[in-house]
C-alpha cells in the first residue's frame, strides 16, 4: 500500500458518510504503522472529528466537484497534511493547539486558511520545525471584510537559531478577485503597514500566498497598486501614521530619496521590493 494514511481516510470517510461506496471500503482499518501519527490527532475519535468537519470537502476520485471550496485540495490531501503536521508538533502543544483550532473551526474560511498553512508546512518540513517556530497566532477570513487589522503575524520564527528564516510570515489564501481589491481596503492596508512597522528589513516579512487560487504576478500587481495609492501616506512621519523616509530606505533600498524614487521601484513587479511575496 503506497499511502496507508490516505487508505485510512477513504475507509473512514465512506464509513461516516454512508453515501459513497467503493471497492475495498467495506470495513474499518487502522494501519498499525500509523498508530503513532494518528495518536497525535487523538486517535480514531480525532480522525472522526476531523472528517465530520470536512464532510463538504471533495474526495480524491471526485474529479472537479467541490475542488474550489478548499483551494483545490481533496479530503485525502487535507487529512494527510493534518496528521503529518500534528505528528511533527506533538511535543509543542502550544503550537499544535492553535493549528488544531483552525483546522477544526466551524468557520469554513478558517479551515481553508489553516489547510493552506498545513500544506505549506508539510511541503517544507526542514523549515517548519518545532525548534524554528516561536509562536503561532492565526485568523483567516474568506473576504477582506473579515481581516483583523490589529492581529499578530500568523507565524513568528525563532530566527536567532536559524538566521536564514524570516522573522514573521503571514498566510493569505485569497483568490485573484480578492487580491485585486486590497489597494482600496482600509483593513488590509492597516494590517500590512503595521507589519512593515514591525520589521527592520523586508527579508524579515513574508506573505505566503495560495498558488492554487492566485498567480504570484497577479498578487505582485495588487501590491503594486497598493504601493502607488499609499505612497504619500507611507512617506509621512511615523508620528503622523506613516513609515517615514528612513524606515522606507531600510526596507526597500538606501537609494530611495523621495516618493518618486520609491514609485520607480514599484513599477517593476520583478524588483526585489516584492520579494516578501512567496508561494506555498
Label each PLM-derived region with a short phrase.
Residues 26-280:
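Catalytic toxin/effector domains delivered as secreted proteins or via bacterial secretion systems
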Residues 2-22:
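Classical Sec-dependent N-terminal signal peptides that target proteins to the secretory pathway
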Amino acid at each position: 500500500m503506497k499511502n496507508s494514511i490516505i487508505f485510512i481516510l477513504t475507509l473512514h470517510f465512506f464509513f461516516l458518510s454512508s453515501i459513497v461506496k467503493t471497492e475495498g471500503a467495506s470495513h474499518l482499518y487502522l494501519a498499525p504503522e500509523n498508530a503513532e501519527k494518528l495518536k497525535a490527532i487523538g486517535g480514531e475519535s480525532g480522525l472522526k472529528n476531523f472528517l465530520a468537519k470536512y464532510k463538504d470537502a471533495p474526495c480524491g476520485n471526485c474529479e472537479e466537484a467541490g475542488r474550489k471550496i478548499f483551494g483545490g485540495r481533496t479530503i485525502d490531501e487535507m487529512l494527510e497534511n493534518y496528521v503529518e503536521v500534528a505528528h511533527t508538533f506533538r511535543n509543542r502543544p502550544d503550537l499544535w493547539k492553535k493549528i488544531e483550532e483552525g483546522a477544526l473551526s466551524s468557520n469554513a474560511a478558517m479551515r481553508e486558511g489553516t489547510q493552506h498553512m498545513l500544506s505549506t508546512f508539510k511541503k517544507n518540513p526542514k523549515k517548519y520545525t518545532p525548534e524554528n517556530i516561536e509562536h503561532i497566532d492565526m485568523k483567516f477570513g474568506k473576504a477582506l471584510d473579515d481581516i483583523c487589522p490589529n492581529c499578530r503575524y500568523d507565524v513568528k520564527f525563532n530566527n536567532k537559531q536559524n538566521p536564514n528564516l524570516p522573522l514573521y510570515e503571514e498566510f493569505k489564501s485569497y483568490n485573484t478577485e480578492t487580491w485585486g481589491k486590497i489597494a482600496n481596503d482600509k483593513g488590509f492596508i492597516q494590517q500590512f503597514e503595521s507589519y512593515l512597522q514591525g520589521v527592520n528589513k523586508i527579508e524579515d516579512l513574508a506573505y505566503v500566498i495560495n498558488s492554487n487560487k492566485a498567480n504570484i504576478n497577479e498578487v505582485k500587481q495588487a501590491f503594486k497598486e497598493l504601493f502607488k495609492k499609499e505612497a504619500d501616506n507611507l512617506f509621512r512621519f511615523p508620528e503622523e501614521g506613516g513609515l517615514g523616509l528612513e524606515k522606507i530606505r531600510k526596507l526597500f533600498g538606501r537609494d530611495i530619496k523621495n516618493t518618486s524614487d520609491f514609485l520607480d521601484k514599484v513599477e517593476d513587479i520583478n524588483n526585489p521590493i516584492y520579494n516578501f511575496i512567496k508561494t506555498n
